[in-house]
């Protein structure tokens, strides 16, 4: 047994403008090469574009998009008796949000377009409406979990 104590789970800090933890989580995932100010610029421009497109509260659109993309269940590779099985596992809310943010950013990076702010805003609006690549990724994950339901006892 380890002699070291377990690390406390840190709570996500909130961003300076919107005072929102979700926004800060998104900024930290946009971040590349330590350029946090650029990540903030990208997100704030995307939020402005969402405001112009939908004419509603952009934070509610962001929340709705993340809620729509957050998976309830995922598959994890587990090696049993020489063969690898995709075992469905339930996902907690924090891990689900992190996955949703990762999928949203991945889908927006793949989109053709001018700049990241434009692509991110388009993906967020699409996800809030229930379409887009991130939603497709969630549905695909749920389908995989359903198909491998027989291996749930390997958990």
UniProtKB/Swiss-Prot annotation:
This entry carries the following GO cellular component terms, namely: chloroplast; small ribosomal subunit
Q: Which GO terms describe its molecular function?
A: rRNA binding; structural constituent of ribosome
InterPro entries xref list: Ribosomal_uS7 (IPR000235), Ribosomal_uS7_bac/org-type (IPR005717), Ribosomal_uS7_CS (IPR020606), Ribosomal_uS7_dom (IPR023798), Ribosomal_uS7_dom_sf (IPR036823)
Q: Taxonomically, which superkingdom?
A: Eukaryota
HAMAP family membership = Ribosomal_uS7_B
Q: How does it assemble?
A: Part of the 30S ribosomal subunit.
Question: Per its UniProt record, what PANTHER family does this chain match?
Answer: RIBOSOMAL PROTEIN S7
Q: What is this protein called?
A: Small ribosomal subunit protein uS7c
């Amino acid at each position: 047994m380890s002699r070291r104590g377990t690390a406390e789970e840190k709570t996500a800090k909130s961003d300076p403008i919107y005072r929102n933890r979700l926004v800060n989580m998104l900024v930290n995932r946009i971040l590349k090469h330590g350029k946090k100010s650029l990540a903030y610029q990208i997100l704030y421009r995307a939020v402005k574009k969402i405001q112009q497109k939908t004419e509603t509260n952009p934070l509610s659109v962001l929340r709705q998009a993340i809620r729509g993309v957050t998976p309830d269940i995922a598959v994890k590779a587990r090696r049993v008796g020489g063969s690898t099985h995709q075992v469905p596992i339930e996902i907690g809310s924090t891990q689900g949000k992190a996955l949703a943010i990762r999928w949203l950013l991945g889908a927006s990076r793949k989109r053709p377009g001018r700049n990241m702010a434009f692509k991110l805003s388009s993906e967020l609006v699409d996800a809030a409406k229930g379409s887009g690549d991130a939603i497709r990724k969630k549905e695909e994950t749920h389908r995989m979990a359903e198909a491998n339901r027989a291996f749930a006892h390997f958990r």
